[in-house]
Amino acid sequence: MRVAVDAMGGDNAPAIEVEGAVAASRQYGIPIILVGDEDRLRQELDHHAASGLDITIHHASEVVGMHDSASDAVRKKRNSSVRLAFELVKDGQACAAVSAGNSGATMAAGMFVLKRISGIERPAIAQVFPTLEGKTLVLDVGGNVDCKASHLVQFAIMGQVYAKHALGIPNPRIGLLSNGEEDSKGNELTRETNAILRQTSLNYAGYVEGRDIFKGTVEVVVCDGFVGNVVLKLSEGLAEATGTMLKREIMGDMIAKMGYLFMRGAFKRFKKTVDYAEYGGAPLIGINGVGMICHGGSNAKAIKNAIRFAHDYATSGVTQRIAEKLSENYGALFPRTGQSVPPVS
């Protein structure tokens, strides 16, 4: 199953995308379609001696820029690399699409081309965070800044299914991000969502606070995209600042430098644990297919890992299982509508 890579997205495209794709093909044996300017992509491939790898090129004559309007770009730039990557998924030529380009356009392209899973109102962008207990999935981290309670409940359903079947967590616990653990805490949105989640068959643990994310108190944390994006950017900034401060302290003291020599292995393992490149990208969950959104400044390692995670996601059966779990909890979502359970599709 091939993975389509938007090779023209990102701050350093197409060099980084091609380097990451070549690494993924070499290391994991994943067949890849590079989508973008054919001449430029062939030139980049020549730099990596990739003639023996299962990498093909699908020409795209347009590129969606970082400052383009997401919806307009997807509709007007029909031959853009990000849209064509999702078209390849729709046509069955690829199992997943990966892009480090305009995240809004990537989300819009996924929704416009692949559509949403039946019953899902809003797809969500999910991000894996390292924790003291392993890893925690947080969603939404930027796709939907204004949400209703039904959206957050659907995020919880999607998060539990993804954590179980794509991340391999047997019975993931779900927490709703709030400003306290008591049911009386939160705002109108979280209190309404909390009440609905308690009626579902999900493994719901109640409210969690920001500090619980890195403790690993639960394996899935649900929030709206505004809060989630703040959490994500704060975490990235904190990790970067911590590393810089630590390096400054070590380099400013001779004894600290000597101690570092003995602890170098531990520092390298820690750096690997908190390095976003190890997690590749953030899956767009809730569309009828697989899309992976990468940081615009991703390096080749991040692209390589995003391709691997996208391929694993595509083979996990998550999309079908989300529809089934949604049907199972439809009564809690819409208790007074009298509507029948939507068909699993």
Curated annotation (Swiss-Prot):
InterPro entries: FA_synthesis (IPR003664), Phospholipid_synth_PlsX-like (IPR012281). The keyword Ribonucleoprotein does not apply. GO terms for biological process: fatty acid biosynthetic process; phospholipid biosynthetic process. It is an enzyme of class 2 (transferase). It is found in: Cytoplasm. Homodimer. Probably interacts with PlsY. Catalyzes the reversible formation of acyl-phosphate (acyl-PO(4)) from acyl-[acyl-carrier-protein] (acyl-ACP). This enzyme utilizes acyl-ACP as fatty acyl donor, but not acyl-CoA. This is Phosphate acyltransferase. The lineage of its organism: Bacteria, Pseudomonadati, Thermodesulfobacteriota, Desulfuromonadia, Geobacterales.
